[in-house]
Amino acid sequence: MEPRFMGQLPELMKNYKAEETEIIAGLQEKLQEVFQKAQQMQKVDRKGKICTMGVSYLQSSVLTGSYDLRIDLYDKEFYLDSAECCTYWKPEFIARYLLKDVEYFKNVIRFKVPQIKAYEIQQFIDGYLLNYMYLLVQFFQQILPQVLDKTKMLFQEAVEENMTVIFGEYMGKGIVVVGEKEE
C-alpha cells in the first residue's frame, strides 16, 4: 500500500509543479465564488462575518469516486450556522492519482482474494485515502495563506481578520490548516 503511494508521489509532485498556476487559479476562483455568496447573504442579514472556512472531503464523494471537496464558510455559530454557504472543488491533480490507485488495488485484491466483499474493498480504500488527505493538508497549509490573502482583500468586510481554515471529513473533526489552533 505505502510503496504504491510513495511510487506515485514524485510524478504527482512533478505534475503539480507543472500545473501549479492553473490549480491555484481554479481554487482562487472557487473561493471568490463562495465568498461572494457569503457577502450577498450578509447584505440581507442572513449570515454574520466569516470566522471559519471548512474544507471537507465527503463520504458520498468517496463512494462515487468523484473526490470533490466541499468548501463551507461559517460565521461565529460554526456548525450551528443555519445559513449554508458552500461550493465544491475537485483537486484533479490528486484525484487522478487516487483513482488510478483505487483501480489498481481493486484489481489486485479481487485477484488475490476472490471472495472479498465490496464493503471490505471500500474499507480498504477509506484507509488508503488518508495518504492523499494528508497530502492535501500539506497543500492547503502551503497554498491557502497566500490565496486567502488575495481573496480576503476583495471581501474584507465579509471576513473576520483572524479567520481559521480547517480540513477534514464533512461535519467531523478537522485539522487547522490556517489560523490559530485552539488549546
Locations of the language-model features?
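Acidic, proline/glycine-rich low-complexity IDRs
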Residues: 1-4, 126-183
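Short N-terminal edge-element motif at the start of the domain
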Residues: 3-50
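Conserved aromatic-histidine-acidic binding/catalytic patches
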Residues: 15, 19-26, 124, 128-136
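Generic hydrophobic secondary-structure signal
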Residues: 27, 31, 53-57, 71-73, ...
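Short secondary-structure junctions and interdomain/linker hinges
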Residues: 34-45, 62, 105, 112, ...
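Short, Lys/Arg-enriched charge-dense amphipathic segments
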Residues: 34-46, 65-80, 108-112, 127-128, ...
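Aromatic- and glycine-enriched beta-alpha-beta binding-site module
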Residues: 44-102
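Low-complexity, serine/threonine/proline-enriched polar segments
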Residues: 84-131
